[in-house]
Amino acid sequence: MKLRASSSPAAVALVGAVVASSWVSTACGPSTPAPAAPAPEPPPSAAPAPPASAAVDPLGPKPEPPAPPPFLPPTPDVFTATGGMTVWLLERHQVPIVSCDLTIPAGASSDPKGKGGLAYATATMLDEGAGKRGAIALSSAIDDLGARISTDTNADASFVSLTVLKRNLESSFALFSDVVARPRFEPAEFARVKDLWQNELKSREKDPDATARVVYRAVLFGAEHPYGHPWDGTAASAKTIAIEDVKSFYAKQWRPDRATLVCAGDVTKPELAHLLDESFSSWKAPSTPVPAGVVPEAPKGPWPKVVLVDRKDAPQAVIAVLRPGVSAADPAVPGLWRVNDAIGGSFSSRLNQDLREARGYTYGARSRYSMSRGPGQIVSWANVVTDKTSPALDALLDDLHKFADGGVTEDEVARTRSQARGEIVNVYESVEAIAGHLAGDASLGLPPDWEATTSQKRDAAQRADLDALAKQYYDPTNATIVVVGPLGVLQASLDKLGVSAPEMRDSEGNVIAAKAAKPAGKPLGPPAAPPAPKPATK
């Protein structure tokens, strides 16, 4: 509201007098002011004048927004299709889009010995020609419908995914079923795919992050363990894989009575059942017994104290602290999400705030725990400028020790609960994310209501629960340190840790030196306190 100026006669006269007085004073030039009379002193008993009161916000105090309520993920409808396929369906009719993910428990852990990457190669070949169409014709048909069909593989399972507008669902679902149930496996296409695959494996050797991930598995599980090799194999194993290996693996592993199809979006159960009968009716399970799913045992130590992949003259180094984790079905998983978020799972986590924000050693320090049918891994890591490798490693270990010994703060309890609620809501924002997330659950052998029950347990975890998990899974005392970088910059940390020499490995995790890293009378206890960050200067 605007305040109006007074327009009364008295006000007009007063303004005119003031203006006239000002004009006369200016025209006549400056005059010497009379000395001001001294202010009378207040009587001794007079109290000091009260301070001016602070301005009062007319809107009142700013209200604090309430904490977001916990979101309870819906449980998908479950039924069995013709041929024995298990189907999970979560209907979402707000947007005319449908997304489906089919998963088979045939991931890298199912690779035959010496054939690492076979599950990956098989999944990659599924959309390189299927049904009546070769690779180019199939790709064109998918594009014409505005659909997206892709394949993927991880340690436990392989996947085929479809996302398409509702109006093109029937035609796209027919192509989707061709990819899953009727791949062509043409030798010429395999030769092309294999050549690209081998080039990707060569380029992986130059990527320190990819190298580190390969080494984690090799160190933690060992070459003989089903989880001990990378999902996409190695340069050596890729050479041994032929198209006949792919056909044999597919015939054994890819069958409808092992498959779970997860669909989310604008489709009803009768509509989906009709599509399955139309497109997948010819996909029959063979009479041979169903292959047992692979659930690897926990890795067995002892593990080396420090492992190094020597990268001379590298501008950056990867530093990591590696420990065995838990399976996806372990009861620790709900609380472990929040513990990991506090130490390294988000930008505001302890590791990132220290190594990035306070010390400036890295663009980001993180931690994660893997989700697998069998034992997982817990790793905390950062990419650091090379000449800061040793102090950054000291700081990383120090942060982990303090976290394991002191547990989480009340602020971290509240923050991780809020972030957990927000993340699960984000998962259910799009049908593509829903289908992919639930297919991941199915691939791990988790029940359809796992998201609902786990989100409640995660939300209910208290400080004492999180403290116990921090101590159990993030204490670096008996962990393995993995470094991808120059040996010379690591020596200071080795001396502090009492390790005479690191175990040397190549980019595929193979031991290349027989020097075992022997502790000099102590485990990986807290290193000397890292230098305090210097105050910023202009």
Give residue spans per PLM region.
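An aromatic/glycine/proline-enriched structural segment found at the starts
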Residues: D57, K62, A223, Y227, ...
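Mature N-terminal segment immediately following signal peptide/propeptide cleavage
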Residues: E64-A106
